Design a protein with these regions (language model features):
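Sec-dependent N-terminal signal peptides
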Residues: 3-15
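Short, hydrophobic/aromatic-rich segments at coil-to-beta transitions
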Residues: 83-92, 112-118
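Functional cores of ribonucleases/endoribonucleases
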Residues: 90-94, 103-104
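Beta-turn initiation residues at beta-strand->coil junctions
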Residues: 92-96, 118-122, 145-148
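Short, surface-exposed coil-to-beta transition loops
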Residues: 99-104, 117, 126-131
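Extracellular/lumenal glycan-associated surfaces
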Residues: 103-111
Length: 194
């Protein structure tokens, strides 16, 4: 009986720890959105954001625009206040291919590790999708996939779980690669700033 009790207690603790982590990430995400909104306000005096916009004409599909916003914190060195370290915490990335709009968000920890990825776009079959990947220090801890079937007006949940299944592995790998790309691009932009 004690063995069953301790097993149940352990399972409940693990579930509780998992939900706390996802809830913590959601809180960090809400904080990042609020901070980004504040920074985007023209009245706000501190604009801790790099913005990159590229525009080009694509043969066969027309105008193409890519916009990436890199939001960061500034941390002063206590020994040398003029020595400021910039820490990326949030990236938005939007682009279009012909008439299709794509949107992505990347949330990073203070140490620059990926914490959350959100992607909304169209798959190879032109179905609208949403991916949400939650991370802890060891890797992915929760995956949520929503998809619009045919001409339904709302996205419906297709998958929710703690692992990346084979069906979503390609999308997951691409999302993680993009998060690393944007972190590297931020580091490059940061090297050009003061």
């Amino acid at each position: 009986m004690k063995k069953i009790f301790f097993t149940l207690l352990t399972v409940m603790f693990c579930v509780s720890a998992f939900s706390q982590t996802v809830e913590t990430i959601r809180k960090d995400y809400a904080d990042a959105l609020a901070h980004a909104k504040q920074i985007n306000d023209p009245e706000y005096p501190v604009n801790n954001k790099f913005k990159v916009v590229t525009e080009q004409m694509m043969p066969g599909s027309g105008p193409h625009q890519v916009t990436a916003n890199f939001y960061y914190y500034e941390d002063e060195n206590e020994e040398s206040p003029s020595d400021i370290t910039k820490s990326i915490y949030y990236v938005t990335h939007s682009y279009n291919w012909a008439a299709r709009e794509y949107y992505e968000e990347y949330l990073y920890t203070r140490k620059g590790k990926i914490e959350f990825i959100y992607q909304r776009g169209y798959d190879d079959d032109f179905q609208l999708y949403e991916y949400r990947f939650y991370f802890d220090a060891k890797g992915v801890i929760k995956v949520i996939v929503k998809r619009k079937k045919d001409d339904d007006s709302a996205l419906t949940q297709e998958y929710s779980g703690a692992t990346v299944t084979d069906k979503y592995k390609k999308a997951y790998d691409a999302a993680v690669k993009h998060s690393e790309y944007f972190k590297g691009l931020f580091d490059t932009l940061n090297s050009f700033s003061y």
